[in-house]
Amino acid sequence: MESLLQKVYDQENLTKAEMNILATEIFEGRLSKTKMAAFLMALKVKGETAEEMAGIAEAMQEVAIQVAFPAGTAMDNCGTGGDKSNSFNISTTSAFVLAAAGIPVAKHGNRSISSRSGSADVCQELGIDINMRPEDMTYLLEKVGIAFLFAPHVHPNMKYVMDVRKELGTPTIFNLIGPLTNPVHLETQLMGIYRRDLLKQTAEVLGQLGRKRAVVLNGAGFMDEASLAGENHYALYESGEVQLFTLSPEEVGLANYPLEAIRGGDAKENAAILRSVLEGEPGAHLDTVLLNAGFGLFASGKVATVKEGVNLARDLVRSGLAKQKLADLITYQKEVLTK
């Protein structure tokens, strides 16, 4: 163990297997807080590699509370957070549109990181229980096609790193790997990331973690979501290869809006925005969700282009199917809670 730590201190890269060993020590509470802090900062200064990100993500998944679902059928669309955009809950809203397309969505989420309301906060405001048993999450995935997985609930071993992360007060590798550690074995994934320089690398990591197809994107204004404010950069992983692309809102028939147009509020305000989008209320909020859902549909392989995805997303909202997914989730959740 000491030799692995020393490698990082000496600015040497770890292999995936070496990082897995070291991360297992962390998640089983065997690494002191002092050594953990030194390791995280040395890793940050050195720069995290794809092998290291995959190694720590796999170790985190191994100690997670497993949520059973047929392998190779579900997707996730959560992002890293950390973009300081204070936007409304874009990926959470988009998840209902993806589910309405018949894609099982295992939505990994947490409380607020860069905004006033995280995925878990707005879910609670909507009446969604974020602390359900694994078997209940499986039931909702099967019956409704969507379930929300509260990260601290499914990753209890993160308790060993929380104090150190808080004390350091700076982003570490844990800010990057959250979306990589969904306890459901995913086939496809849309992942927003706040660092554009890591698009290709993160897409490679998703491939190492078994995704068949994935899109990693960074929006205009360095958002961890697709943005209407300008050019969006994204990486597509498929068949073992990564390709880099850019896409502007105009290319998919959407208008430009400044970042200020999608500012969010607290959980109550963001829940109201989510409902208004699912009702089809026109404007920047709806168009932003259409763009992100379009990317999600493209990442899933449901459509051949993002533009086709945007058009399908619009149809799913107009038809009321996306709104119905929220209603169904609440209905079936009550059934679970009364068992």
From Swiss-Prot:
Enzyme class: transferase
Reaction equations catalysed: N-(5-phospho-beta-D-ribosyl)anthranilate + diphosphate = 5-phospho-alpha-D-ribose 1-diphosphate + anthranilate
Annotated Gene Ontology cellular component terms: cytosol
Binding site for Mg(2+) 1: 91, 225
Keyword presence, Lyase: no
Residues involved in anthranilate 2 binding: 165
Cofactor descriptive note: Binds 2 magnesium ions per monomer.
InterPro entries in alphabetical order: Anthranilate_Pribosyl_Tfrase, Glycosyl_Trfase_fam3, Glycosyl_Trfase_fam3_N_dom, Glycosyl_Trfase_fam3_N_dom_sf, Nuc_phospho_transferase
Pathway(s) the chain acts in: Amino-acid biosynthesis; L-tryptophan biosynthesis; L-tryptophan from chorismate: step 2/5
EC number in record: 2.4.2.18
Binding site for anthranilate 1: 79, 110
Required cofactor names: Mg(2+)
Keywords: Amino-acid biosynthesis, Aromatic amino acid biosynthesis, Glycosyltransferase, Magnesium, Metal-binding, Transferase, Tryptophan biosynthesis
SUPFAM superfamilies: Nucleoside phosphorylase/phosphoribosyltransferase catalytic domain (SSF52418), Nucleoside phosphorylase/phosphoribosyltransferase N-terminal domain (SSF47648)
Binding site for Mg(2+) 2: 224-225
GO molecular function: anthranilate phosphoribosyltransferase activity; magnesium ion binding
A biological process term (GO) from this entry: L-tryptophan biosynthetic process
Annotated residues for binding of 5-phospho-alpha-D-ribose 1-diphosphate: 79, 82-83, 87, 89-92, 107-115, 119
Family named by the database record: Belongs to the anthranilate phosphoribosyltransferase family.
Subunit record text: Homodimer.
Function: Catalyzes the transfer of the phosphoribosyl group of 5-phosphorylribose-1-pyrophosphate (PRPP) to anthranilate to yield N-(5'-phosphoribosyl)-anthranilate (PRA).
NCBIfam families the record matches: trpD
Protein's name according to its UniProt entry: Anthranilate phosphoribosyltransferase
Species per Swiss-Prot/TrEMBL record: Listeria welshimeri serovar 6b (strain ATCC 35897 / DSM 20650 / CCUG 15529 / CIP 8149 / NCTC 11857 / SLCC 5334 / V8)
